[in-house]
């Protein structure tokens, strides 16, 4: 009993001090998707890419390197350097201009007149460089996802 009375305050102090330290926030890879695709005169695509931060802390994104594959065609490279601070469990966008292949442009044109009834599958994958809130150095996070885009009714050359 005497031994318990002597060490109990020390144990309680240890538990209290352990609870006072900063909690480590969980860090998860982001999701990247096409928020909007606009066809510019001359055939260039203007992509609005959404970067979704799935982590419990802010992430400071600085670059993206990956590929976009449309309708099982040959993928095209995506690369962008930028500065984007995305809060925890939130998303933000970057804009990127790319020159699609002829086959990609034809696949997109095939669904243009169908409005929201037509859709085109795509796959986007690669890595994004970001610095998590509680870390000193940026690191690379892999991402991969598939989705569909379709023409926006009444807005020519725009797909979501």
Predicted regions and their residues:
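Short, solvent-exposed beta-strand/turn "edge" segments of beta-rich domains on protein surfaces
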Residues: 33-44, 52-60, 85-88, 111-118
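Terminal connector regions
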Residues: 102-157
